[in-house]
Design a protein with these regions (language model features):
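Short helix-capping segments at alpha-helix termini
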Residues: 136-141, 240-244, 323-328, 382-385
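Preference for extracellular/luminal or secreted protein segments
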Residues: 20-104, 314, 323-324, 342-408
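Phosphate/pyrophosphate-binding betaalpha-module
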Residues: 232-235, 239-249, 275-290
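Enzymes and membrane/adaptor proteins characterized by extended Gly/Ser/Thr/Asp/Glu-rich
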Residues: 76-96, 104-229, 251, 256-270, ...
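Sec-dependent N-terminal signal peptides of Gram-positive bacterial secreted proteins and lipoproteins
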Residues: 1-24
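Structured alpha-helical segments in the cores of large, soluble enzyme domains
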Residues: 100-105, 201, 279-289, 317-323
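Catalytic PLP-binding core of fold-type I/II PLP enzymes
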Residues: 318-331, 335
Length: 408
C-alpha cells in the first residue's frame, strides 16, 4: 500500500512539473522583418526642344533691338537733324563715315541694315572702311546693300572714283548675250560688291518691259517677253549668288506695265490675275526661299478693287506672294520715302501697314524716328502683337545666319 501511495504521489509531482513547464515556454528565434519600398516607375519630365541659334539670339534681344531689325535705312537717317528732303537730295553731302553722334544714334535705333547711295561713296578705300564701320557698330551685323543693277542704275560702276566694268543695260545684255551674259553680269557685279564689303544687291530687275509709256523701267528690265525675262533674271541672280551677294528681285507685283512713276505717285497695273500669272509674275517665281523680293508701290485694282499700293496690301503680299505663289524668303518694301507713300500715309502708318500686309523689312522710312516709334508703340499697346514681331525677326535672323552675315 505504501508503494502504491508513493507511486501515486510521484505521478502527481510529475504532472505538476509538466504543467509548470508549459507555463514557461522557451522563446522562439524569428528572422527580423524589414519594410521594403518598391520604386514606382514614372515618366521622365517633358523637356523643351533646344533653341535654334536664331531663337537663342532672339531670346536675348530687347524690344528696341527687335524693332530695329525691321529697318533698312540710309546712313544719313542717323543724322536726326536732316529731314527727308535733305537725305534724298543727290547734290547735298552724304554721310561717308560713322562719327560719334551717328554711333550714339545707332544705340537708340539699332537698325537691321543700310543701303548706300552715290553720295555715301567717295572712293574705294572710304567705301571699304565705311562698310566695315557700319558692320562693326551693331551687335547684330546688318544687311549692307546698294542698287547695282548694271546700266543706268549702278552706284559704284557709274561713280567717277571707280574703275569698274560697265554694262549698257540689262535689256541690252539680255538681247545680245542671253542667259550666259546675264549670269556673267551678276558674277562681275557681285564680285566687286563683295570686295567693298556689301552682302546684298537690290537687283535683278524682275519686271517685264511691256508698256512703252513706262517712265521708270524700260531697258532696266531684261526683256519684254516674260519667259525670256524669267530666264535672264534667274541667270543674273545665280551670278550674284556665286559671288556671295544676296539678290533682291524687284518690283513685285510688276512695275513693267505701269504708266506712273512710283517715286511720285501710286503706280497702277490694270491687268487681271490670269494676265499677271502669264506675264508679270513669271520672273518672281524664279526667286528662291533663300532670296528676297522687293514689293513696289503698285496697285492692282482688278484684284483688290482698290488703289492700295501692294506694299500695304495683305491680299497681295500675304495672299498672293506668300500663299498663292509660295514664296518663303524675305519680303522687303520699296523705299517708304517715295511719293506713292508719303503723299498718302504718315511714316508710322506706312511702317505698320507694310508689316500688317506681311512685309518683313522696311526700307528707308521718310522719318526714322516716327516710323520706329510707331512700330514700338504698336507692339507695346498690343495692336501689333509681339508674337508677330518675334516671328518676323526670327525670319530675319535665320536669313542672316544662312548667309553668314551673323554667326550662330
Amino acid at each position: 500500500m505504501k508503494i502504491i501511495a508513493a507511486l501515486t504521489a510521484l505521478c502527481t509531482l510529475t504532472v505538476l512539473a509538466a504543467g509548470c513547464a508549459q507555463q514557461a515556454p522557451i522563446p522562439v528565434q524569428t528572422a527580423p522583418t524589414f519594410l521594403t519600398t518598391v520604386p514606382v516607375q514614372t515618366a521622365p519630365p517633358a523637356t523643351e526642344p533646344p533653341l535654334s541659334p536664331a531663337e537663342r539670339l532672339l531670346s536675348g534681344m530687347t524690344l528696341r533691338e527687335k524693332v530695329g531689325q525691321l529697318f533698312i535705312i540710309r546712313p544719313d537717317a542717323l543724322d536726326l537733324s536732316l529731314d527727308a528732303a535733305d537725305i534724298d537730295d543727290p547734290h547735298s553731302d552724304g554721310v561717308t563715315t560713322l562719327t560719334g553722334p551717328l554711333s550714339e544714334a545707332l544705340k537708340t535705333y539699332p537698325v537691321g541694315g543700310f543701303v548706300l547711295f552715290s553720295k555715301n561713296i567717295t572712293d574705294p578705300q572710304q567705301l571699304t572702311d565705311f562698310n566695315a564701320q557700319l558692320r562693326d557698330a551693331l551687335p547684330i551685323a546688318p544687311f549692307l546693300a546698294t542698287d547695282e543693277e548694271g546700266g543706268l542704275v549702278a552706284r559704284l560702276a557709274n561713280h567717277p572714283a571707280f574703275s569698274l566694268p560697265k554694262f549698257s543695260s540689262p535689256g541690252a545684255v539680255g538681247a545680245q548675250f542671253g542667259p550666259e551674259g546675264a549670269h556673267d553680269m551678276g558674277m562681275t557685279i557681285g564680285g566687286y560688291l563683295r570686295e567693298y564689303g556689301f552682302n546684298m544687291d537690290f537687283a535683278p530687275i524682275a519686271d517685264v518691259n511691256t508698256n512703252p509709256r513706262n517712265p521708270v523701267i524700260g531697258t532696266r528690265a531684261f526683256s519684254s517677253d516674260p519667259v525670256q525675262a524669267a530666264e535672264l533674271v534667274r541667270a543674273m541672280a545665280d551670278g550674284l549668288w556665286q559671288s556671295g551677294i544676296i539678290p533682291v528681285f524687284k518690283h513685285f507685283p510688276g512695275h513693267g506695265d505701269t504708266a506712273e512713276d512710283s517715286h511720285r505717285s501710286i503706280a497702277v497695273n490694270p491687268k487681271s490675275e490670269s494676265e499677271l500669272l502669264e506675264c508679270e509674275w513669271l520672273p518672281f517665281l524664279q526667286a528662291e526661299d533663300q532670296e528676297c523680293i522687293m514689293v513696289g508701290h503698285i496697285a492692282l485694282p482688278a484684284l483688290t478693287g482698290a488703289l492700295t499700293p501692294a506694299t500695304l496690301s495683305p491680299s497681295l503680299v500675304t495672299g498672293v506672294l506668300r500663299e498663292q505663289l509660295g514664296f518663303q524668303g524675305l519680303i522687303i518694301t520699296d523705299s517708304l520715302a517715295m511719293g506713292a507713300i508719303t503723299k498718302n500715309y504718315t511714316p508710322a502708318e506706312a511702317a505698320l501697314g507694310a508689316l500688317n500686309a506681311g512685309c518683313d523689312l522696311l526700307l528707308m522710312p521718310q522719318d526714322l524716328e516716327k516710323a520706329f516709334s510707331g512700330v514700338l508703340s504698336a507692339v507695346e499697346d498690343g495692336s501689333f502683337p509681339e508674337a508677330r514681331l518675334d516671328q518676323v525677326v526670327l525670319r530675319i535672323l535665320n536669313f542672316k545666319l544662312i548667309h553668314h552675315i551673323i554667326d550662330g
